[in-house]
């Protein structure tokens, strides 16, 4: 999928790879909010002024979606970054070299230059500043009060707290394949994979090891984590299966699945050789159909990425055996017909693009196979916005950032847009 956003990930990855060369799968925490920070509900109810946004957006060359009431923007003239609110006010001036993450838990990560980055609060006040001794992790900032930091000289990562103090030294091996380099704490635990022992290790926020298990684990969700184990067969070949462990590392769902996602509202996408659908916490299939797992062709040597659906706002997209996508509800009823198609490589049996996405704020993104442009549908499958945007993100706090003809703007669930839709 071709997608642009405000963050200069290409630049960041390039610097990462250069530094490394020089040196060598398929929750928001509400308890760590500072008392002065608005709740998620208060932030989402912030009044939006679409007319004001329409007036200011032409001055920016790119923008992100809103997070905690603010959106990152890049000034066309200076090519520097700052933040606007939902009324179009530039509350944090465009003065940064670039922005690494949106606001999360009241903090954003910004670069003052290519050699110096900082944590700032929502008033633009600097909390802590860092040089290139280590870099911010490739994730979306703070979770559970912690954020990953990367040391490319030693290929290690650690964690800082919201004051900028190093809580866990950068001594954990960075995970380079089959997932992001750095992961967030989830359910109070963080995972990392030891390639030498082929075991997954879970640590708490002090860096203490809680347990380890054989195989490559995913993050915990609703108290369970998927783990992928590979077994040697009689012919010296091997096969891999996925099961689930609890927070003690005990197996609670047997290793019988070829693909599996993570639990949301007590359901998890899973697939065996004969069955595909959603399982419950006992590992039993509750919703099944003539489905298959979406496996994306990532074009990387270390493998391809299975994208497992989850329920969001009561609906989940699924792919049928014919390669068409639609949406089902939690009874298994098809609510939006199987009419969305993806580019599919028959030789590799891999999908190249994603035609539809989860629902957020009452709308879901869709992507037209022919034009590779994005639009939005409502929960009945009606097109609120036809596929006309070169890039688009999910609805967030009542708005979604979209790109049309090289210009960024916002849309809402009522069909309003900061663009002149008559052109």
Please identify what each model-predicted range represents.
Residues 1-3, 26-49:
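Intrinsically disordered, low-complexity repeat and linker tracts
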Residues 21-25:
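C-terminal motif of bacterial Sec signal peptides marking the signal peptidase cleavage site
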Residues 15-19:
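Hydrophobic core
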Residues 37, 41-423:
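Residue-level detector of conserved, function-critical positions
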Residues 2-12:
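Bacterial N-terminal signal peptides that target proteins for export
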């Amino acid at each position: 999928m071709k997608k642009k956003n405000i963050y200069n990930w290409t630049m960041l990855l390039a610097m990462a790879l250069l530094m490394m060369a020089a040196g060598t799968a398929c929750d928001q925490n509400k308890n760590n909010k500072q008392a002065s920070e608005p709740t998620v509900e208060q932030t989402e109810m912030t009044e939006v002024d679409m007319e004001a946004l329409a007036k200011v957006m032409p001055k920016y060359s790119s923008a992100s979606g809103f997070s905690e009431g603010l959106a990152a923007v890049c000034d066309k003239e200076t090519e520097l970054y700052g933040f606007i609110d939902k009324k179009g006010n530039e509350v944090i001036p465009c003065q940064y070299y670039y922005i690494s993450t949106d606001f999360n838990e009241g903090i954003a990560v910004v670069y003052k230059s290519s050699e110096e980055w900082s944590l700032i609060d929502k008033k633009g006040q600097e909390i802590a500043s860092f040089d290139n001794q280590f870099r911010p992790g490739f994730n979306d900032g703070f979770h559970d009060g912690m954020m990953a930091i990367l040391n490319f000289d030693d290929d290690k990562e650690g964690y800082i707290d919201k004051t900028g103090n190093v809580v866990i030294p950068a001594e954990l091996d960075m995970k380079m394949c089959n997932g992001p380099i750095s992961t967030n704490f989830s359910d109070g635990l963080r995972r990392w994979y030891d390639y030498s022992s082929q075991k997954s290790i879970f640590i708490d926020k002090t860096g203490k090891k809680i347990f380890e298990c054989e195989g490559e684990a995913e993050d915990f969700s609703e108290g369970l984590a998927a783990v992928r184990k590979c077994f040697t067969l009689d012919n010296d070949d091997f096969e891999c299966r996925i099961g689930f462990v609890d927070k003690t590392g005990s197996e609670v769902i047997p290793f019988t699945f070829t693909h599996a996602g993570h639990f949301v509202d007590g359901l998890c996408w899973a697939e065996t050789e004969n069955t595909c659908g959603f399982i419950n916490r006992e590992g039993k299939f509750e919703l099944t159909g003539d489905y298959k797992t979406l496996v994306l062709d990532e074009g990387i040597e270390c493998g391809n990425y299975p994208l497992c659906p989850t329920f969001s706002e009561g609906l989940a997209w699924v792919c049928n055996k014919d390669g068409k996508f639609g949406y089902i509800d939690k009874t298994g009823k098809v609510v939006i017909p199987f009419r969305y198609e993806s580019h599919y490589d028959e030789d590799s049996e891999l999908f190249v693009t994603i035609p539809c996405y989860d629902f957020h704020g009452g709308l879901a993104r869709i992507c037209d196979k022919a034009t590779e442009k994005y639009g939005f549908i409502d929960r009945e499958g009606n097109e609120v916005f036809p596929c006309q945007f070169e890039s688009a993100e999910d609805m967030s706090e009542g708005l979604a950032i979209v790109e049309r003809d090289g210009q960024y703007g916002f849309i809402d669930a009522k069909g309003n847009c900061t663009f002149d839709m008559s052109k």
